[in-house]
């Protein structure tokens, strides 16, 4: 049985990915800063016959991450699948951005991904097999007004993905990224999409050939494909799950 760690797993995309990987037969570490919500997702998985363990950690705190990873390893064994989904968002005009806002965005979105990946990597190296999926954002591809700090932090994730693919490929480890676009029931959706005028929301939805807003399960399906044994020749790629918005 493969063991997967999913960060930001208590709600939205992370919760959907956790459920999907568990349904595919993996033991899943449901890691989030929100311990009660993470426990609820893990309980749902276990009640459905899967295997899951709720974990609490701040991904910017290396010692907390190490402790969470050790708990998951003790429960289920070595971790060979990692989904870096945890992150924050924000909206502020570029000219009004503060150093603190910029630094915090990169600390969580970029440094957090760096820390978790470094902590889990020894398990993958020892196994000679691993799958890393980073959840970035379509904002990193197209840019987003009032979101310079967010877009840049997610763009760094795409660059990190390509670099890890090159470094880790010879070790049997792949690394890919998925940049979602306006997915329902997520922090991004609630803060930006749902708050926009209905005319703007309709225009965004119609911008791609699949005229609907994305669902967390859409991202989970792509992630489940990327972590399969059969996708070992796919690495360093940006898998756009965006309804065809960026063709």
Predicted segments, located by residue:
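Short, small/polar-rich loop/turn modules that mediate ligand/substrate recognition or access, typified
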Residues: 83, 169, 174, 234-236
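Substrate-binding pocket helix/loop in short-chain dehydrogenase/reductase
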Residues: 93-94, 101-106, 193, 200, ...
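Active-site helix of classical SDR
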Residues: 117, 153, 161
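Alpha-helical segment proximal to the catalytic Tyr-Lys
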Residues: 122, 166-170, 232
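Residue(s) in the substrate-gating loop at a strand-loop-helix junction
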Residues: 137
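Short C-terminal tail/terminal secondary-structure segment
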Residues: 142, 224, 235-247
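A glycine/serine/threonine-rich, flexible loop-to-helix segment
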Residues: 170, 183-208
